[in-house]
């Protein structure tokens, strides 16, 4: 029988060092609240029950944690009296009798399933407490994990550590797994006889040992346990997340010319043999199929780019953009809530919004779908193999049939049938010899202005 597990996410901090109008756990990493990343990791570790300890911005934090993948119950911590006190905000849930209790933090968005599973494996092996630690490049300020043999005997805070203990680089990551059958008894034994009068979860190690139990430590990469308290740390975490995800995608067959300049969102999906040129930003909700090329300086969000399509350079795809196979959206084009058919070309200086563009159609430079009347949005429908001449304005709602041709510079306000040619502009007039007359008139007007100004 599988062991049951309750994960307790501590997210009740005041976030004062973040200097923000909202809780730090709501700040986005890769376009997603950092606490949502933590819940994702729990779901990946097959943990289905979560107790979320909240304080500031309780409703918003609970909403961000409810990703739909796990059952989350929000519990309000009214007083801030230390980590052990925070865990006991979930007393009723702990009392239900889970095999494992896993304590994690809401501000560690880089955590993955692996160390969480390792901690639970430690409990399954008969240990009472498992602490997740890391080897620190610079351990200054961290609590040291004092290990003898394979047992964890103490967690020593930096200020209390001896010179010898300060040389230890194995540090406390804060995350902990506790035997669910003993959790409440152990937590109730934690005292507050310290300078701050708070109840510290780290005391469990020595409490367990004093009762004849056993604690161990399992190691995770340092970056996975990186917490976030300031904007600078938020930027550092973003950088680490981006590096990790870029590396994963390149190993999966995505080419990035200058990966350090490509920015991804938490749900960016790039297929094998996609090529991404430098300085590309992927907002949430982007899917790019095999063989597509995203040229430099393009920005995509909420878009689907199908196989073999080309985007950019300097293109913007907004929510609802759907580019068909082998289609093209070129430089200085914006596409929003529009389908571009297979093989269609929108090559330059164009806005396509609330529209359907048929397969094989060519949209000339400077074309605009005029989709907004100041109150409502309207749809433009362009059939297959049509040709829209440069600098045309298509005033929606309007339909253009298959194979139709729109002359350059046209303003189209009425439907155009299939295979028709439409002109929507004033007829050109040529007046021979008129240019010198106009020039003389303009000169006279200019001289008159100068004389008038001098007389003032």
UniProtKB/Swiss-Prot annotation:
Annotated spans, Pyrophosphorylase: 1-231
Keywords from the named record: Acyltransferase, Cell shape, Cell wall biogenesis/degradation, Cytoplasm, Magnesium, Metal-binding, Multifunctional enzyme, Nucleotidyltransferase, Peptidoglycan synthesis, Repeat, Transferase
Catalytic class of the enzyme: transferase
Family: In the N-terminal section; belongs to the N-acetylglucosamine-1-phosphate uridyltransferase family. In the C-terminal section; belongs to the transferase hexapeptide repeat family.
HAMAP family (UniProt xref): GlmU
Reaction(s) catalysed (UniProt annotation): alpha-D-glucosamine 1-phosphate + acetyl-CoA = N-acetyl-alpha-D-glucosamine 1-phosphate + CoA + H(+); N-acetyl-alpha-D-glucosamine 1-phosphate + UTP + H(+) = UDP-N-acetyl-alpha-D-glucosamine + diphosphate
Protein name: Bifunctional protein GlmU
Active-site residue list: 348 (proton acceptor)
Gene Ontology cellular-component annotations: cytoplasm; membrane
Subcellular compartments: Cytoplasm
Gene: glmU
């Amino acid at each position: 029988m599988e062991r049951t597990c309750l994960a307790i996410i501590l997210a009740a901090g005041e976030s004062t060092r973040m200097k923000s109008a909202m809780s730090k756990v709501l700040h986005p990493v890769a376009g997603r609240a950092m606490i949502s990343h933590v819940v994702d990791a729990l779901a990946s570790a097959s943990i289905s029950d979560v107790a979320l300890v909240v304080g500031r911005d309780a409703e918003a934090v609970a909403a961000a944690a409810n990703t739909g993948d796990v059952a989350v119950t929000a519990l309000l911590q009214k007083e801030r009296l230390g980590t052990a006190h925070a865990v006991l905000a979930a007393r009723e849930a702990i009392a239900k009798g889970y095999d494992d209790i896993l304590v994690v933090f809401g501000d560690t968005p880089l955590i993955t399933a692996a160390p969480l599973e390792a901690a639970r494996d430690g409990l399954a092996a008969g240990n009472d407490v498992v602490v997740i630690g890391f080897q620190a490049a610079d351990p200054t300020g961290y609590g040291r994990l004092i290990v003898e043999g394979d047992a964890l005997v103490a967690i020593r805070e930096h200020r209390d550590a001896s010179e010898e203990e300060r040389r230890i680089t194995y540090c406390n990551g804060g995350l902990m797994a506790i035997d669910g059958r003993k959790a409440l008894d152990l937590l109730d034994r934690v005292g507050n006889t310290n300078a701050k009068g708070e109840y510290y979860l780290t005391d469990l190690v020595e409490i367990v040992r004093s009762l004849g139990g056993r604690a161990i430590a399992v190691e995770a990469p340092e970056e996975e346990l990186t917490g976030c308290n300031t904007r600078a740390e938020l930027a550092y975490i973003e950088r680490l997340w981006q590096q990790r995800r870029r590396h994963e995608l390149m190993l999966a067959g995505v080419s990035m010319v200058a990966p350090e300049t490509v920015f991804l969102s938490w749900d960016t999906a790039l297929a094998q043999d996609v090529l991404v040129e430098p300085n590309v930003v992927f907002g949430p909700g982007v899917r790019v199929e095999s063989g597509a090329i995203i040229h430099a300086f393009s920005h995509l969000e909420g878009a689907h780019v199908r196989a073999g399509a080309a985007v950019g350079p300097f293109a913007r795809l907004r929510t609802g953009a759907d580019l068909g196979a082998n289609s093209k959206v070129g430089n200085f084009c914006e596409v929003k809530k529009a389908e571009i058919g297979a093989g269609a070309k929108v090559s330059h200086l164009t806005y396509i919004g609330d529209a359907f563009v048929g397969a094989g159609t060519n949209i000339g430079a400077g074309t605009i779908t005029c989709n907004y009347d100041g109150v409502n949005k309207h749809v433009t429908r362009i059939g297959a193999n049509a040709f829209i001449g440069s600098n045309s304005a298509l005033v929606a709602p309007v339909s253009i049939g298959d194979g139709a041709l729109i002359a350059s510079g046209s303003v189209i306000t009425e439907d155009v049938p299939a295979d028709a040619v439409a002109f929507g502009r004033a007829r050109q007039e040529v007046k021979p010899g008129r240019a010198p007359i106009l020039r003389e008139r303009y000169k006279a007007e200019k001289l008159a202005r100068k004389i008038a100004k001098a007389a003032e």
